Regions:
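A short, charged, amphipathic alpha-helix used as a generic interaction element across diverse proteins
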Residues: 111-119
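Amphipathic alpha-helical interaction surfaces in cytosolic regulatory modules
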Residues: 26-102
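Acidic phosphotransfer microenvironment of two-component signaling modules
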Residues: 30, 109-110
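Short acidic-hydrophobic, aromatic-tinged amphipathic segments that line or gate anion-handling sites
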Residues: 101-109
Length: 120
């Protein structure tokens, strides 16, 4: 993984959580996308991408999240984000409409609760 970003994963039942730390841009977005997709299985009903420790997200990163959400929707899976507020990432999420394309939560427990309460 690029020195710009680090991705750590953990599992909560059948829900993978990917914590992205650092900067996401065109130089590392393919690698990050491949890692995110590798976390999904046919058993997964959802995935959470935690951007709380992400310091930069360019248009390539935004596009990755939109694309991943669409891919998951076609498989009857849901993508949710965790975004610290206030943060530069929260502003980018609002400006680009990511918050209308997928659920965005302030904390991981909030995101997990939402996905478990509404598995559809």
């Amino acid at each position: 993984m690029s020195t710009l970003a680090r991705l750590e994963d953990e599992w909560h039942d059948e829900i993978p959580v990917a914590r992205v730390q650092g900067e996401v841009d065109a130089s590392n977005v393919k690698e990050i996308g491949d890692r995110l997709r590798s976390l999904l299985s046919n058993r997964s009903v959802a995935m959470i991408v935690d951007l709380s420790a992400t310091t930069y997200l360019d248009s390539a990163g935004i596009n990755l999240l939109f694309t991943l959400a669409e891919e998951m929707r076609s498989r009857q899976q849901r993508l949710a984000l965790v975004v610290a507020d206030p943060s530069p990432i929260a502003r980018m999420v609002a400006l680009t409409g990511l918050d209308r394309a997928m659920p965005v939560h302030r904390t991981l427990p909030e995101a997990l609760g939402d996905l478990r309460d509404d598995p559809a």
